[in-house]
Amino acid sequence: MDKKIVLLVDDDSDLAKMLKIRIESEGYEFKHAGDGKQLLEILNVKKPDVILLDIMLPNIDGYSVLREMRKNERYADIPVIILSAKEKKKVGDLFILEKIAFFIEKPFDTKDLMEKISEAITYGGRRQT
């Protein structure tokens, strides 16, 4: 059976290194994009099972990336977990309009993140909290 792919989109390389170790230790394949442009390039090669998306990104911000993804039939159904230092209420409209699986405020507990990743993959992003 193929490993499920978790794609992190965040320009924080230290966070990426830490999450790579944690996510791979749980049996997932880990991919990393440092910005929205890299995300769109990766999506053209391999479709991930879940995307961990930061809102504050260089070049193309997380809001714009998410809107572009949702317009494309190939990517519209990928569950997205927002990882952001912004409070949930500040991205509330995005959360509802763009069908976000979960919102996790930074800093976060990796155990909680792993539970949300598992749930997002299992339910395909259809459950929201």
Residue locations for each model-derived region?
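The feature encodes the CheY-like receiver
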Residues: A16, P58, A76, K88
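Residue-level signal for the "D+5" position in two-component response regulator receiver
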Residues: H32, L57-I60
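Short hydrophobic/Thr-rich beta-strand motif most characteristic of the beta2 strand and flanking loop
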Residues: G27-G34, I42
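Acidic catalytic/metal-coordinating carboxylates
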Residues: D35, D61-R67
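Alpha4 helix (beta4-alpha4-beta5 surface) of REC/receiver domains from two-component response regulators
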Residues: S64, K86-I104, K111, E115-S118
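Active-site beta3 strand of CheY-like receiver
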Residues: K46-L52, L57
